[in-house]
Amino acid sequence: MKFLKKIKEFLLNFLNLTKLFSNVKNIAIVLLAFYLSGSIFNLHKIFLGVISLSFISSAIYIYNNFSDLKSDKYNKNKDYYSEAVKYFGEKNTLVLNIIFIVLGLYFGSTINFYFLFALIALFIIGFLYSFKYTRFKEKVILDILFGATLTFLFRFIAFWFIFSISLPPILAVIALVSAKSAGYMLYKEVDRPYLTALKIKNSITIASKKTIITISSLLWFISFLSFIFLCLNSRYFQIEYLGKLPLNFLFLIPLAAPPLAVIYLSALNKIKTQIKYLRILGFCYWTLIMIIVWILLI
């Protein structure tokens, strides 16, 4: 029983440190890039793309947890991240970080130069976000830009380069970047008390809760509007550089309501459930949505 307990403890801390389940979003993004590109399905390339980008994403998460070791232990929404770093030790955490980077870049190099370039850019963005001499996560505007906007932009661009060496569809980029930026603002709004206590001045703490929620809502509106035009474009406009999705994908819009309601209620302090449990529920929910989308595509 002690052995099983140790295995469970190891796995739990490993998952908390690397946030592997958060990489499920990479599957959704690569499927979107594949469909919009109109390319022939290539499971080998898609698999390598998801694996390599997930290694880089987890490397960014690991380094962020390492950099936030002292501050996270005072945040009940993130204290398990600092516990994970302590469990493995700071030295081993950095070693694991390097291993993930090397593996990500190695697998990425087997696809093409453009994909590898996007991976490197993504890592640099994540590094600057958390690095103690830059700490863009504690800077106004730069926190959202490097913590959300650019990260999803380069995730999508990287996957797009698997299928096409060209500019990605504009509407898809706008939809993804707006949604990620909006979600990031709400996610950080939940941490406002801790950020304020640490006297951190970033986009969240210098603005009021009402302002953050208003801007986030506007970004969600832009994202949904872009998605609607992506669907309508396939039948009514036929503008290639905008991107096209099946018209019947419009039914997916109401499915975004439950997770949006949860994150908004959390930001308004109406839900007391810890973020880590909401993440687990979100993982299960979006995995189910991806299965539904895949069934529609085939």
Language model segments and positions:
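Membrane-embedded alpha-helical segments that form the functional core of polytopic membrane enzymes
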Residues: 28-67, 115-128, 166-186
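Helix-coil boundary and interhelical linker segments in multi-pass alpha-helical membrane proteins
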Residues: 33-51, 104-117, 154-174, 228-246, ...
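Intramembrane alpha-helical segments
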Residues: 10-12, 82-165
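Short, Lys/Arg-rich, polar N-terminal cytosolic tail immediately upstream
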Residues: 1-15
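C-terminal ends of transmembrane helices
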Residues: 61, 70, 126-137, 263-269
